[in-house]
Curated annotation (Swiss-Prot):
Self-association and partners: Homodimer. The monomeric form is inactive while the homodimer is active.
Glycan-carrying positions: 61, 179, 353, 356, 396
Protein name listed in UniProt: Carboxypeptidase Q
Catalytic residues, chain numbering: 336 (nucleophile)
One Gene Ontology term from the biological process aspect of the record: peptide catabolic process
Signal peptide: 1-20
Molecular function in Gene Ontology: carboxypeptidase activity; metal ion binding; metallodipeptidase activity; protein homodimerization activity
Family from the record: Belongs to the peptidase M28 family.
SUPFAM superfamilies referenced in this protein's UniProt entry, alphabetically: Zn-dependent exopeptidases
Length: 472
């Protein structure tokens, strides 16, 4: 049956097949929820066509193959790097060749930091080369490096209790991994807290749920009025080893060398493409992922997958000849890893039209097998999204959970626009996150097919509804 559906929808231009009539007064909907449910249910055949094309049809594995071509040939795409700008230009050409509309680049200014050469060696109690990855925005060491005794702590509280021991030392954090959102504070704030008690540098246990001797990088933040000290992540294994040594009273000495340097901000671009709406072209449903990555691995998982299923969503809709009532806009963000820099500048440029944004969507937590969406919005909007997700019952992907926030869409969500993030299986995500292991080997083409289908169905149906999602 699915192949019959695909053959029918693949051969004609569907334009907008979901039915719906607005009954509004002073901008307030007078439709009952049952009427809205009927409108969404009328999109069932379109949803099946998208699923069949993405998962079983000629488009299967396309997002995976497109992604592999980019990351294998360009590699990692650090903010401020030539690789990132090369990738942006390639994507600009790709989106044009794909037949999408209003393809353009929106200029932004982004940070430019480079890690340079870096090394760490344990000198006492034995010689041991320590794998490190400097953290984004860290300063470097003097050319001769920093050689100092180590103080190992497991928390900020312990650091405060032992503050008198920290001066002139390298602080090593061996904090337990609870979850990413709770543990990442040691990466972002570890240098500042160590500097406050007089440390010369900080080394932080990688924020990872599993390790095969692999350090994980990421952004860190300095604080005005606090001395800047070099900071890097080390492996889980080395952090635990030094913690065991310290518990036995063994003196540890490390020599740390880091060539990290921050350069003036540089030019970059957010990459934009659309399928212009047939009835309300000024209104927008936004789908997105970020094109930049860290400078290790390939940035395939974070966030090549999210960027490419967002492109694939528009490709699927275009291939089926669909044109929703309002505009579907793809944005591939730049400099997300530095704190959503490109996304903030996009918001500043476009917030004048905030009343026309129905839904902002971001995929930046992997493209493993999805189970649904995370959503932030009014109760009425959530109820509507639950009906939209029911169209994905053929894939058994219907969950709508809370917390749809994402770094690049938070600006809109905080201003009241409904937001959604892809909900998928994160079991392996932090094995590879911000590490040399983030390569195409992590990616699964079949899982990407399903993720793209979810992304396309949700974005299309919301864009084709007669009315925008209700806000709080």
């Amino acid at each position: 049956m699915k192949f019959l559906i695909f053959a029918f929808f693949g051969g004609v231009h569907l334009l907008s097949l979901c039915s719906g009539k607005a009954i509004c007064k002073n901008g307030i909907s007078k439709r009952t929820f049952e009427e809205i449910k009927e409108e969404i249910a009328s999109c069932g055949d379109v949803a099946k066509a998208i699923i069949n094309l993405a998962v079983y049809g000629k488009a299967q594995n396309r997002s995976y193959e497109r992604l592999a071509l980019l990351v294998d040939t360009v590699g990692p795409r650090l903010s401020g790097s030539k690789n990132l700008e090369k990738a942006i230009q390639i994507m600009y050409q790709n989106l044009q060749q794909d037949g999408l509309e209003k393809v353009h680049l929106e200029p932004v200014r982004i940070p430019h930091w480079e890690r340079g050469e870096e090394s760490a060696v344990m000198l006492e109690p034995r010689i041991h080369k320590i794998a490190i990855l400097g953290l984004g925005s860290s300063i470097g060491t003097p050319p001769e490096g920093i050689t100092a005794e180590v103080l190992v702590v497991t928390s900020f509280d312990e650091l405060q209790r032992r503050a008198s021991e920290a001066r002139g030392k390298i602080v090593v954090y061996n904090q337990p991994y609870i979850n990413y959102s709770r543990t990442v504070q040691y990466r972002t704030q570890g240098a500042v807290e160590a500097a406050k008690v007089g440390a010369l540098a900080s080394l932080i246990r990688s924020v990872a749920s599993f390790s095969i001797y692999s350090p994980h990088t990421g952004i860190q933040e300095y604080q005005d009025g606090v001395p800047k000290i070099p900071t890097a992540c080390i492996t889980v294994e080395d952090a635990e080893m030094m913690s065991r040594m310290a518990s036995h009273g063994i003196k540890i000495v490390i020599q740390l060398k880091m060539g990290a340097k921050t350069y003036p901000d540089t030019d970059s671009f957010n990459t934009v493409a659309e399928i212009t709406g047939s009835k309300y072209p000024e209104q927008v449903v936004l789908v997105s992922g970020h094109l930049d990555s860290w400078d290790v691995g390939q940035g395939a998982m974070d966030d090549g997958g999210g960027a490419f299923i967002s492109w694939e969503a528009l490709s699927l809709i275009k291939d089926l000849g669909l044109r929703p009532k309002r505009t579907l806009r793809l944005v591939l963000w730049t400099a997300e890893e530095q704190g959503g820099v490109g996304a903030f500048q996009y918001y500043q440029l476009h917030k004048v039209n905030i009343s026309n944004y129905s839904l902002v969507m971001e995929s930046d937590a992997g493209t493993f097998l999805p189970t649904g969406l995370q959503f932030t919005g009014s109760e009425k909007a959530r109820a509507i999204m639950e009906e939209v997700m029911s169209l994905l019952q053929p894939l058994n992907i219907t969950q709508v959970l809370s917390h749809g926030e994402g770094t690049d869409i938070n600006f809109w969500i905080q201003a009241g626009v409904p937001g959604a993030s892809l909900l998928d299986d994160l079991y392996k995500y932090f094995f590879f996150h911000h590490s040399h292991g983030d390569t195409m080997t992590v990616m699964d083409p079949k899982q990407m097919n399903v993720a793209a289908a979810v992304w396309a169905v949700v974005s299309y149906v919301v864009a084709d509804m007669e009315e925008m999602l209700p806000r709080s």
